Regions:
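N-terminal beta1-alpha1-beta2 module of alpha/beta enzyme domains
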Residues: 1-74, 178, 301
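Flexible, glycine-rich active-site loops centered on histidine and acidic residues
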Residues: 6-29, 88-155, 203, 208-212
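Conserved, mostly hydrophobic/aromatic
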Residues: 41, 45, 53, 71, ...
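Short, acidic/polar
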Residues: 28-41, 98, 182-192, 277-287
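Alpha-helix-loop-beta-strand connector modules within alpha/beta enzyme cores
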Residues: 62-82, 137-144, 312-330
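Active-site mouth loops of central-metabolism enzymes
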Residues: 17-32, 85-92, 174-185, 240-241, ...
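N-terminal small/glycine-rich loop or linker at the start of catalytic domains
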Residues: 1-25, 118-122, 159-177, 246-272
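Hydrophobic faces of well-ordered beta-strands that scaffold small-molecule active sites
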Residues: 11-15, 49-51, 80-82, 110-114, ...
Length: 330
């Protein structure tokens, strides 16, 4: 089957309060900085803002729900989302309430991106969740969310969670709850997307790998006869650096991502990042679009203090080169 993809390309920005890059001096998140950042992203014409999630990470990171609630006060236009939230680490009951609340506070401009995690096993240890249960917990948690979001008297009996006759009010602003997108490229992950979710969020893949992932989702959805009544969005989180030369961009990306992930990221940066002059970066984005990506989330890499300049530079020098895709007929 063919997935019901729109034609228009949307662009998002990853990260609000997060210090994961080499920087100067101590990192103390500031409200004024968040306000300026969200205003800048809105003014530059991007479509969305996203934050990641870790309970215990190599470098400082704040809770995504609290960041988004703070950011949503600043813009009445932008869509906000988690990219991605490690749902297996939490009980889905309180999460259902938090998401319903966020959806109302954002007036229905929220997308819930989820993932299984696993790269940092200590997160699972501190949350008391066996690492080998993360996939099964995610699947069941998604079912619990949808059940509670009906706003009706709900019952669920599963492997991990059990309740009977629970009514959670109010339900989310968006009928049926906000769209849920999921990351992952394993066979289990793509089958989960095909069966239960409204979108796919890829990460650290090439355009060819992206296309293969979408094909697997389409085949799995076709095998069970799923119609995607709410539509389907194919998205990609893309590490990006616009610079004077490809080599300068590669050096900045390597240093930044090696710090973030505590490993040598040079070869991965060469393969998976969009780097170089504006034309080179745009060409990479176009290849992802041709592979089926319709929402590209830009994670600008480089020194933390440069992110305002990176957001402005991309908007001024790269977005105009993508206008044909951004105004494509839906």
């Amino acid at each position: 089957m063919d997935l019901p993809l729109d034609n228009r390309l949307s662009l998002g920005i990853q990260t609000i309060h997060r210090r994961t890059e080499p920087g100067v001096g101590p990192w103390l998140p500031e409200i004024d900085e968040l306000v300026k950042l969200v205003q800048l992203v809105d003014r530059c014409g991007y479509d969305s803002m996203w934050v990641g999630d870790h309970v215990a990470f190599a470098l400082p990171i704040l809770d995504p729900f609290l960041q988004l609630a703070q950011a949503a006060v600043v813009s009445r236009r932008l869509t906000f989302g988690t990219g991605v939230y490690l749902l297996p680490l939490r009980h889905p009951g309180p999460v259902a309430k938090q998401i319903a609340t966020l959806d109302h506070l954002m007036e229905g401009r929220f997308i819930f991106g989820v993932g299984v995690g696993g790269e940092f096993p200590k997160e699972f240890e501190v949350c008391g969740v066996p690492l080998n249960e993360r996939g099964a917990r995610l699947t069941e948690s998604l079912q619990v969310l949808r059940t509670l979001w009906t706003g009706q008297r709900a019952t669920h009996h599963g492997r991990f969670f059990n309740f009977e006759g629970v009514t959670m009010q109010p339900p989310p602003r968006q009928a049926g709850g906000p769209p849920i997108w999921a990351g992952g490229r394993s066979d289990a992950a793509v089958k989960r997307v095909a069966r239960l979710l409204d979108g796919w969020m890829s990460y650290v893949v090439t355009p060819d790998m992206f296309r293969q992932g979408l094909d697997k989702i389409a085949d799995a959805a076709g095998a069970i006869g799923r119609k995607f009544e709410r539509g389907f969005v194919a998205s990609h989180l893309l590490f990006t650096r616009v610079d004077k030369t490809y080599e300068a961009a590669l050096e900045a990306a390597t240093k930044s991502l090696s710090t973030r992930y505590a490993m040598d990221f040079r070869r991965a940066a060469q393969r998976y990042c969009a780097l170089g002059r504006p034309q080179e970066v745009v060409e990479t984005i176009r290849r992802f679009y041709e592979a089926g990506a319709r929402h590209v989330i830009l994670d600008f890499v480089g020194p933390y203090e440069e992110r305002f300049d990176e957001i402005e530079r991309f908007a001024a020098e790269a977005i105009p080169l993508l206008q044909d895709l951004r105004t494509a007929h839906v």
